[in-house]
């Protein structure tokens, strides 16, 4: 399971002209689900995403996680993160989970975030989405479990 996380000052996702999720300061989480992923991996990734210390403390050091910084989370499904790009000029998606499995694990990940009392907003799984963000600094990390 893969999360591309970006520290943002604001972010939103729109589907068919409707805003489905919007946050102020916090994390935009682009989530990719691979074939061998399961709930255990989703739990570990959620723990890492919410605990990752990429927000500045009073001394300007990256020492706070999103909860400590008072931020929110916007989770957007992105199957292209599971692409195999090692060769050729076209990505292969053979490493990606089936749509049903990916949606179930995406929903599970979102619910785990909410159980941690995070303000968690979402896109719409498998929809054609427009994602807007203001990347803070920029700060972007690839987390994989």
From Swiss-Prot:
Its EC number is 3.1.1.96. It catalyses: glycyl-tRNA(Ala) + H2O = tRNA(Ala) + glycine + H(+); a D-aminoacyl-tRNA + H2O = a tRNA + a D-alpha-amino acid + H(+). CDD domains: Dtyr_deacylase (cd00563). One of its GO terms (cellular component) is cytoplasm. Pfam families: Tyr_Deacylase (PF02580). One of its GO terms (biological process) is D-amino acid catabolic process. GO terms for molecular function: D-tyrosyl-tRNA(Tyr) deacylase activity; Gly-tRNA(Ala) deacylase activity; Ser(Gly)-tRNA(Ala) hydrolase activity; tRNA binding. Keywords: Cytoplasm, Hydrolase, RNA-binding, tRNA-binding. It is found in: Cytoplasm. NCBIfam families: D-aminoacyl-tRNA deacylase. Homodimer. Belongs to the DTD family. An aminoacyl-tRNA editing enzyme that deacylates mischarged D-aminoacyl-tRNAs. Also deacylates mischarged glycyl-tRNA(Ala), protecting cells against glycine mischarging by AlaRS. Acts via tRNA-based rather than protein-based catalysis; rejects L-amino acids rather than detecting D-amino acids in the active site. By recycling D-aminoacyl-tRNA to D-amino acids and free tRNA molecules, this enzyme counteracts the toxicity associated with the formation of D-aminoacyl-tRNA entities in vivo and helps enforce protein L-homochirality. HAMAP family: Deacylase_Dtd. This is Probable D-aminoacyl-tRNA deacylase. The gene is dtd.
